[in-house]
């Protein structure tokens, strides 16, 4: 009986967290596969509108593309 209650509670918590994630990050559920193309189209105004966390992610992405290990994976 306790295990069934625990499973139901876990399932409800997963559903609730999924709902809040879709509210916080709606673009992740909109089938937006052109994100890399959008990065190529950034101009100065777009860069000034970015949040600090976005800049950190862009920096991490650029470092990943520059790393030798990443290039070796696709040769």
Curated annotation (Swiss-Prot):
- Which tissues does it occur in? Expressed by the venom gland.
* Endpoints of the signal sequence: 1-24
Q: What are the alphabetically sorted keywords of the record?
A: Secreted, Signal
Q: Where in the cell is it found?
A: Secreted
Top-level lineage group: Eukaryota
List, alphabetically, the GO terms of the cellular component aspect: extracellular region
Q: Which family does it belong to?
A: Belongs to the non-disulfide-bridged peptide (NDBP) superfamily.
Descriptive protein name: Anionic peptide
The organism encoding this protein is Tityus discrepans (Venezuelan scorpion)
């Amino acid at each position: 009986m306790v295990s069934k209650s625990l499973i139901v509670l876990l399932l409800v918590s997963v559903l609730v967290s999924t709902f809040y994630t879709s509210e916080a990050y709606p673009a992740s559920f909109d089938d937006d596969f052109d994100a890399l193309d959008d990065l190529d189209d950034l101009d100065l105004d777009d860069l000034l509108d970015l949040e600090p966390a976005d800049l950190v992610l862009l920096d991490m992405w650029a470092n990943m593309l520059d790393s030798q290990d990443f290039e070796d994976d696709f040769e």
